[in-house]
């Protein structure tokens, strides 16, 4: 998992940090999973290019942009909103065109109310989230987005949930290191509360965090977080957040799937079958879960043009995996049959 921020994308942006292109390059080169967040900056006044995402109580650099007014057609805020959605859709379409699926976590940490999209309560925030989902999915046709909703476990948190139909994964941002010391807790009570919040229908991830929980605590508490994604720089590389020994232990354990262990997700079967099943059944041309004389006869008939093969049978007939079915495969199949006799 690599986290990437699309914070420089908006309709009046003056600088492009090529986050979309960097996402495409990393996913295609390293075969990893990109987790995108969008610190959506907006102006306080019409026509202004001074844009921020924090509210006044959270930062000296803030915006007074109103989410409620932005949801009203005809306002200047609504024009900014829709133009920004069009811009982010353009960037996300680059990913779709490159066949790059991503974890997409917009309007994150809304309930904290330190960002403008959460400053006016749950109803306008949910309305904006659903508008964004409808625009990106139905208007712009982006089917490469796995939608992550950033939740909490407060008594008010259910009021903020936008709905099962627009959420794929429930995420939680964990920042609980105190006094310059890491907190290795699995926060299992939080995990199980989030699981229960959707009646177990959604996977739950640590979408953003400081300390990665220790392997011991994760196993002991059975807190099966889908993934974790430490924030950048010292959040990952300092002893006060993530001790080196803890990082080595979790990344080298069977519990954690690291980049080198991740299967090729573009080829991974969606039906839950083993991605390597074709290799295991190489030579099983008639698809009866055995390699024998019957497969040799069927392959001979195919090479003579007497029969055709289904795609699955063709893949099994490509014994030497050179993406072609010919006499070399027949020779290898005969050898395999003798070896199995």
Kindly label every feature range from the protein language model.
Residues 5-13, 68-82, 119-122, 171-182, ...:
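The substrate-binding groove and active-site-proximal loops of carbohydrate-active enzymes
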Residues 12-15, 19-131, 138, 142:
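Substrate-binding cleft of extracellular glycoside hydrolase catalytic domains
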Residues 18-21, 87-91, 150-162, 185-194, ...:
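Alpha-helical scaffolding within the catalytic cores
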Residues 29-34, 97-103, 140-146, 165-168, ...:
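Loop/turn elements at helix/coil->beta-strand transitions in domains of secreted/extracellular proteins
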Residues 105-107, 111, 129-156, 201-212:
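Aromatic-lined carbohydrate-recognition surfaces of secreted/lumenal glycan-active proteins
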Residues 202-276:
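Substrate-binding cleft of secreted/luminal carbohydrate-active enzymes
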């Amino acid at each position: 998992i690599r986290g990437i921020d699309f914070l420089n994308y908006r309709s009046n942006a003056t600088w492009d940090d090529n986050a979309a292109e960097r996402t495409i390059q990393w996913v295609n080169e390293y075969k990893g999973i990109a987790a995108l967040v969008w610190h959506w900056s907006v102006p306080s006044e019409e026509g202004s290019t001074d844009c921020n995402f924090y509210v006044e109580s959270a930062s000296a650099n803030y915006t007074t942009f109103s989410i409620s007014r932005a949801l009203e057609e005809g306002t200047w805020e609504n024009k900014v909103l829709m133009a920004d959605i069009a811009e982010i859709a353009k960037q996300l379409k680059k990913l779709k065109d490159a066949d790059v699926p991503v974890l997409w976590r917009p309007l994150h940490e809304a309930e904290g109310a330190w960002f403008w999209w959460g400053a006016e309560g749950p109803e306008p925030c949910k309305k904006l989230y659903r508008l964004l989902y409808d625009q990106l999915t139905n208007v712009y046709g982006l089917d490469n987005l796995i939608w992550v909703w950033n939740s909490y476990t407060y008594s008010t948190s259910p009021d903020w949930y936008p709905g099962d139909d627009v959420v794929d994964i429930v995420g939680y941002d964990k920042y609980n290191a105190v006094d310059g010391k890491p907190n290795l807790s699995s926060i299992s009570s939080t995990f199980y509360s989030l699981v229960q919040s959707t009646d177990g229908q959604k996977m739950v991830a640590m979408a953003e965090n400081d300390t990665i929980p220790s392997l011991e605590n994760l196993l002991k508490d059975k807190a099966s977080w889908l993934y974790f994604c430490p924030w950048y720089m010292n959040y990952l590389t300092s002893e006060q957040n993530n001790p080196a020994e803890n990082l080595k232990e979790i990344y080298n354990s069977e519990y954690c799937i690291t980049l080198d262990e991740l299967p090729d997700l573009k080829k991974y079967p969606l039906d839950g079958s083993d991605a390597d099943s074709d290799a295991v059944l190489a030579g099983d041309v008639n698809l009866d879960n055995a390699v024998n004389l019957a497969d040799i006869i069927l392959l001979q008939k195919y090479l003579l043009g007497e029969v055709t093969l289904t795609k699955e049978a063709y893949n099994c007939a490509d014994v030497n995996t050179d993406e072609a079915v010919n006499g070399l495969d027949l020779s290898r199949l005969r050898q395999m049959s003798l070896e199995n006799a």
